[in-house]
């Protein structure tokens, strides 16, 4: 990778102040620079992190008003409502998954790196999960307790979200990559992602139903984990192919 390409990639991260760029290029790996750029974008646009959290809280706060304040009913449907709200919150940010990288030309520069494009996409998906999805997972047990959801079901909810959301994040990235550069990327992305979301949601709801009944949840959790692992391995390859096609079509 030439110094010109490296400098062009670092410019959106605002590293021009680095006094010794050659030393920086030698010391800092490509992976660290990609993570640093994601952190910089998150700091520059904190609303992208806060917006899904506020959306989740808003939807959950409307449930007792729209249905009933009965604690027994809320305890039965609370975990399912949190899952639905989390799913909608993930869709909220999926439209802009690769948009800033595509507009800045960063995706084109990825093609010149001495790393597989699928590996770089995997780093991007991991950073997105840590910054945008993990906060939703961490607050989900607290929200479940406010809806009178039993403690064991709240724990099952937390585990299912922790295991299942990597697959949902991968599918969100795939939908965003397939519709990259489209004027109606939001609608098209949802149409692409929803069929992929269905198996994950079905397995997660099965875990929650078994948790409420006091049945064994480990087999479904193992299947859900295998689904996420397979998605983490295969989806970045599909996303990298979609990015190559979209970049080739835009030139």
What is the predicted function of each stretch?
Residues 158-177, 229-230, 234:
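Hydrophobic alpha-helical transmembrane segments of polytopic membrane proteins
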Residues 24-52:
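Aromatic- and glycine-rich beta-strand/loop motifs that create alpha-glucan
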Residues 78-98:
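Long, hydrophobic alpha-helical segments
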Residues 232-251:
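Junction motif at the cytosolic side of a transmembrane helix
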Residues 65, 175-215, 219-223, 227-233:
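Transmembrane helix segments
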Residues 46-68, 83-87, 192-203, 229-235:
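Hydrophobic alpha-helical transmembrane segments of multi-pass membrane transport/permease proteins
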Residues 122-148, 167, 171, 204-205:
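Hydrophobic alpha-helical transmembrane segments that constitute the membrane-spanning cores
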Residues 91-111:
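Transmembrane helix boundary and interhelical loop/hinge segments in multi-pass membrane proteins
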């Amino acid at each position: 990778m030439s110094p010109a390409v490296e400098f062009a990639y670092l410019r959106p991260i605002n590293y021009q102040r680095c006094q010794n760029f050659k030393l920086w290029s030698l010391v800092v790996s490509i992976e660290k620079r990609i993570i640093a750029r994601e952190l910089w974008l998150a700091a520059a646009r904190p609303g992208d992190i806060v917006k899904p959290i506020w959306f989740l809280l808003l939807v959950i706060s409307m449930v007792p008003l729209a249905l009933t304040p009965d604690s027994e009913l809320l305890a039965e449907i609370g975990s399912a409502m949190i899952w639905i709200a989390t799913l909608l919150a993930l869709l909220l940010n999926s439209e802009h998954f690769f948009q800033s990288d595509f507009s800045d030309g960063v995706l084109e520069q990825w093609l010149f790196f001495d790393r597989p494009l699928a590996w770089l996409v995997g780093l991007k998906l991991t950073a997105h999960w840590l910054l945008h999805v993990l906060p939703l997972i961490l607050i989900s047990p607290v929200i479940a307790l406010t809806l009178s959801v039993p403690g064991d079901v709240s724990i099952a909810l937390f585990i299912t979200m922790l295991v299942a959301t990597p697959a949902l994040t991968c599918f969100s990235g795939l939908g965003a990559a397939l519709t990259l550069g489209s004027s109606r990327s939001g609608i098209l992305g949802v149409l692409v992602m929803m069929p992929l979301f269905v198996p994950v949601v079905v397995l997660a709801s099965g875990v929650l139903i078994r948790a409420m009944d006091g049945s064994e949840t480990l087999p479904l959790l193992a299947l859900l984990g295998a689904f996420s692992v397979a998605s983490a391995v295969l989806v970045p390859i599909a996303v990298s192919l979609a990015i190559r096609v979209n970049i080739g079509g835009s030139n």
